[in-house]
Amino acid sequence: MGQNGRVPCGLGLGWGDVDVFLVEATGVASVICYAAAICGCVYALAAGLLARGFVRSELAPAKDFPSVTILKPLHGAEPGLLTNLAGFCVQDYPGPVQIVFGVEDHADPAIDVVSRLIAEFPDCDIELVVNSYSHGTNRKVSNLINLAAEARHDVLVLSDSDIIVDPDYLKNIVGPLDAPGVGLVTCLYRSAAAPGLWPRLAAAAIDHHFLPSVLFGLKLGLAKPCFGSTIALRKTTLAMIGGFHSVVDQLADDYALGEMVRRAGLNVAIPSLIVEHACTHRTARDLFHHELRWARTIRFVNALGFIGSGVTHAFPLALLGTVLGGITPASIIVIAALACRFCLQMQLDRALGLRSNPFWLGPLRDLLSCAVFFASFFGRAVEWRGRRYAVLADNTLAYTGEVSRNANSVPSGALV
């Protein structure tokens, strides 16, 4: 170091200059965080109103009742599987309904669950397909291809194994297919949490983060989703877009199906029907890796929209602004962010008929969601059903051969 505390090499900067620069930089970063948090507060208030309006909108149940085949790919006997599947066997639907379940392995414990289902509902048209043939790297889609070969009816309904439905589900999901120009129907989902902290945190992510963000994006025309919770389409539409083979290597297979239908000139309908998604995460690791896969999936298919969603993390951003800039009058934004988040939570719970979580769970959920958001930018690997995949530039999957410690503990469906 030269005289007067100057850094040599002709940089002309002393340590005092560096200190000033760092103070100014953290001050600017603090202002940016506060500004983003204010945007997040506005979003929370608007999203709550949109959610109430969506839930109150009327459904258009089917007037005609075409024959339907429900395709259910399974893997493992996850908690509550029998109850989840039984809901599809008690549908109040006048038309013929075929249910095709499928697994890849003869030793899969889901086989016993389906056997019990067949015994409990002998009048239901239920088939079980056990087929280990792999058509590509996405094992769920590979399973669907094997199931679709057994489908006898024109309308296909796909639904993940962790989805819970009411008896009028088929009526309400098949009805919109009759509308002119509609090629596919999908629907939103809310949580059905098992007891425990991790399932409740997972449920809060769905009810208080996922749902309002999708509704907000739909209202502004920024979101074009398609969810594995439900996909209904006709065989002719599926054939027109290349069948399930066209997405057998895709990470976001459900999103890809919706995009292909739109590119074919047809619409994707999203009625106000909301099904339930079972949250049964057993450990913090299960929860984090499930949500990391979800976040990375969204980032890969809609990078700009995902980056923009960062402002929805109002409380963590306001907190970071205070950490960077110190406690100032602007720190009141932290309290405002908490108040707006609590307001959004109450409106959603009331609209969806949910039991409200303790207040402390909301800030904890917000901090976890923000951590997952930033973690999703580091790496292109995802875990699904005990296998690890690298996501390539075209959003296809490459199996890396690594197996996680809890092969059967993560819920089944891809959350997109």
Region roles according to the model:
Residues 19-86:
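N-proximal low-complexity "stem/linker" segments adjacent to membrane-targeting elements
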Residues 22-27, 35-39, 49-51, 60, ...:
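Membrane-embedded multi-pass helical conduit in multi-pass membrane proteins
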Residues 66-69, 98, 256:
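Cell-envelope/extracellular polymer assembly enzymes that use nucleotide-activated donors
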Residues 85-135:
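Acidic donor-binding segment of Leloir-type glycosyltransferases
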Residues 109, 159-176:
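Acidic donor-binding/catalytic loop of UDP-sugar-dependent glycosyltransferases
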Residues 116-149, 153, 172-241, 245, ...:
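Long helical/loop segments within the catalytic core of UDP-sugar-dependent glycosyltransferases
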Residues 144, 153-164:
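Short beta-strand-to-loop acidic/aromatic patch adjacent to the donor-nucleotide binding site
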Residues 249, 255-277:
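Catalytic donor-sugar/metal-binding loop of nucleotide-sugar-dependent glycosyltransferases
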